[in-house]
Amino acid sequence: MRSVEYLAYLRSKYGIRPRRRLGQHFMVDDNILEFMVEAAEVREDDIVLEIGPGPGLLTRYLMTRAGQVIAVELDGRMVEILKRELGEAPNLEIVRADFLEYDVPDDVNKVVANIPYNISSPITFKLLELDIDVAVLTYQREFAERMVAEPGSKKYSRLTVMVNLLADVELLRGVPRRAFIPPPRVGSSVVRLTPKSEEERPDVDPDTLESVCRALFQHKNKTVRNALLLSAHEWATDREQAREVLEELPEDLLSERPLHLPPERVAELAAAIESALG
């Protein structure tokens, strides 16, 4: 049964309606659902996490390929439908939980999901803390484009830097609004995240990196020196300490503009600041 027909069957049987406050838009395009599973190279020895499965449209595809699927859903109505319709499958575990508070099992090695767009950022960074092989996710198109933006471009941002320091990011394809019921207000994109190993990640405290990055991109068109001074509260005790630290940093780095700094240079700057702060 095609996904659009399966959803119609569920709506007729259970009277379900998507809840916009939970960011529910159900993908019914079977070509894209299959594409996502293929992009993650889901195999029978994989344990796959799905975030926000809703009525189980993507879940059905994952179940045919994965050794185990763990579907984490916040909406109690959807959990009951999943249990009634798919719950007897031996390789499906249905969990009612807020993913942001959920303790992901250590043996999960892949994530495939159409995530709620209103919490895309916290979901992404939680996933990048996990020891997984790959995540294939659907994002709002504008968010996805920021993730892969080039230094100097209008969409280059703190998000770009932080994500690219932690993972290899690939924008795989666009998704039209009509692929969902109800259609979201904007287009979407499928993105593949391949987390970097510990050796590939920057050798700097994550909190320092985040605070420096936040300071830089609050004033991304100013020089690095001015951006760090204007947002000294983000990374230093006060402006006096900030000035002392800046005296120890390379002038060529301070005269750059955050908008043009590649992620690796931002990490280099954060490491230098961390060292100067002691």
From Swiss-Prot:
Keyword terms of this UniProt record: Cytoplasm, Methyltransferase, RNA-binding, rRNA processing, S-adenosyl-L-methionine, Transferase
One Gene Ontology cellular component annotation held by this UniProt entry: cytoplasm
SMART domains (alphabetical): rADc
InterPro entries linked to this entry: KsgA/Erm (IPR001737), rRNA_Ade_diMease-like_C (IPR023165), rRNA_Ade_Mease_Trfase_CS (IPR020596), rRNA_Ade_methylase_Trfase_N (IPR020598), rRNA_adenine_dimethylase (IPR011530), SAM-dependent_MTases_sf (IPR029063)
List of residues binding S-adenosyl-L-methionine: H25, M27, G52, E73, D98, N114
MF GO annotations: RNA binding; rRNA (adenine-N6,N6-)-dimethyltransferase activity
Location within or outside the cell: Cytoplasm
E.C. no: 2.1.1.-
Record's function text: Specifically dimethylates two adjacent adenosines in the loop of a conserved hairpin near the 3'-end of 16S rRNA in the 30S particle. May play a critical role in biogenesis of 30S subunits.
Family: Belongs to the class I-like SAM-binding methyltransferase superfamily. rRNA adenine N(6)-methyltransferase family. RsmA subfamily.
Name by which UniProt lists this protein: Probable ribosomal RNA small subunit methyltransferase A
